[in-house]
Amino acid sequence: GSSSPGVAPADNTGPRAAPSSPSQLCAVCGDTAACQHYGVRTCEGCKGFFKRTVQKGSKYVCLAEKSCPVDKRRRNRCQFCWFQKCLAVGMVKEVVRTDSLKGRRGRLPSKPKCPQESPPSPPISLITALVRAHVDTSPDFANLDYSQYREPSPLEPPMSDLEVIQQFYSLLTTSIDMIKLFAEKVPGYGDLCPEDREQLFASARLELFVLRLAYRTALEDTKLTFSNGSVLDKRQCQRSFGDWLHAVLDFSNTSYSMDIDISTFACLCALTLITDRHGLKEPHRVEQVQMKIIGCLRGHMPGGGGSSSGAAPLQRVLGALPELRSLSVKASQRIFYLKLEDLVPAPPLIENMFRASLPF
């Protein structure tokens, strides 16, 4: 498979030809590995990830069953399983130089400062809080609901227009309820004035619906997984979503090719919510929260921390935000059309979307 741009530069280096023996492959992901790092033959990508994880004391969360595939192409998709694989093949944490040892080629500091005293654990980091907010409002992939799933079949009578729209409204409202919960868990959101919270949420809810749905949709998969755990065949959604579905799937392919990890994705969701919107009462306070999240994302991304090498991946991730806005407009138009058709009374949440003024 082709390597993902901007995520692990080490993937693009090294000879094109297959290594002559398995001993030249990375024990973690199978990529080309020139030599040993931290006790095991590993590639530069896995070495760098292991080192960063240990030095920063990062804690990861698996969204699935802690058995995600870890190979050259997919290792970035679950950092929890990637790190566990590093440990499983024998990479040694104790060999990684911490900040106090940097530049000393692994020699111990001349006077260790009370080695038996461990420093107090820092308060929960912003990035951890954002990942937790995302995980807590995402479906449990071990317990998905296939009760409404149907593959198109000539033997199966199609659903009526009425049923299709009812199903669509139900999926949309439960998803938006989950997005509301996500918003409330984003650090800093609750400190904003009530009017600005409402404005930010109303502006971002359809963008977040698209973003989260796209992230859960694998490239070659024929299924869509919604926030409440319901799984549908993509073709089941064609009638209710209309042309909007194609735009969502195109965006899904784009975001899949970026191959962003869960921490980056959680930051992207937060930045979709916490951003400058028309009519904010205290835009400066919103900007303060936004800058904290951007700083957090910059520090997390490979080559981040203000170095020029981190600019390209960061800009590419942030470049998804304007596209989300146009997809949100398409969504509003589609929902407005279904509401005008009036086959099914729109639930209050949908009705209220258009109460003040048309959002497109």
Swiss-Prot record:
This is Probable nuclear hormone receptor HR38. One of its GO terms (molecular function) is nuclear receptor activity. Residues 23-98 bind DNA. PANTHER family: NUCLEAR HORMONE RECEPTOR, NUCLEAR HORMONE RECEPTOR HR38-RELATED. It comes from Bombyx mori. Residues 1-21 are annotated as: Disordered. A zinc finger (NR C4-type) spans 26-46, 62-86. It is found in: Nucleus. GO terms for biological process: cellular response to corticotropin-releasing hormone stimulus. Transmembrane segments: none annotated. SUPFAM superfamilies: Glucocorticoid receptor-like (DNA-binding domain) (SSF57716), Nuclear receptor ligand-binding domain (SSF48508). One of its GO terms (cellular component) is transcription regulator complex. Its main location: nucleus. Keywords: DNA-binding, Metal-binding, Nucleus, Receptor, Transcription, Transcription regulation, Zinc, Zinc-finger. Residues 122-357 form the NR LBD domain.
